[in-house]
A protein has these predicted regions:
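DPxDG-like acidic metal-binding loop motif
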Residues: 60-89
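Phosphate-handling active-site elements
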Residues: 47-54, 83-94
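Surface "functional belts" at beta-alpha junctions
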Residues: 21, 33, 88-143
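N-terminal beta-alpha supersecondary unit
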Residues: 1-63
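Short amphipathic alpha-helical segments
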Residues: 15-17, 73, 124-125
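Buried hydrophobic packing segments
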Residues: 42, 77-81, 98-102
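Residues at secondary-structure transition points
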Residues: 29-37, 68, 72, 76, ...
Length: 143
């Protein structure tokens, strides 16, 4: 059972996955309230699914680009759960996660996230016959 955490942007989210796929997903607008909102939502999602935290087998967490404070909150919760439950934690680049939602696209995908101060982070992705992959470096664009 995998817990996924994304607190990189103001649109935060969590999800629980098992061998059968997505069990529960919740996304919410978090206006700099990640610290207060994240753990109660994880607890509620587990309770709604009848899942004890001790049954988690791994945690994935967004690692940026994104809000420094938001990333710290997500990484701290992920690392804390991993240490207490003795489970692995894996970091997932935020742009990769955003683009992955479009992995079936036959056209190239450009994932873009605001980086603050008039800057944007971007990367290009494409699907070929066998795989989906990033086909550019992560780029910081100044406007």
């Amino acid at each position: 059972l995998l817990l996924a955490i994304d607190t990189a942007t103001k649109m935060a989210g969590i999800a629980l996955y098992d061998q059968d796929g997505l069990r529960v997903e919740e996304m919410w607008w978090s206006n700099a309230n990640h610290t207060v909102e994240l753990m109660p939502r994880i607890v509620r999602a587990c309770e709604q699914q009848g899942i004890a935290a001790t049954t988690l087998t791994g945690v994935s967490v967004s690692i940026g680009p994104g809000s420094f404070t938001g990333l710290r909150v997500g990484l701290s919760v992920a690392k804390g759960l991993a240490l207490v439950l003795h489970i692995p934690v894996i970091g997932v680049p935020t742009l990769d996660a955003a683009a992955y939602a479009h992995k079936r696209s036959t056209l190239p995908v450009c994932a873009v996230l605001p980086a603050g101060r008039g800057r944007w982070c971007a990367a290009f992705y494409q699907t070929d016959a066998d795989s989906w992959q990033r086909c550019s470096d992560y780029t910081l664009i100044r406007t």
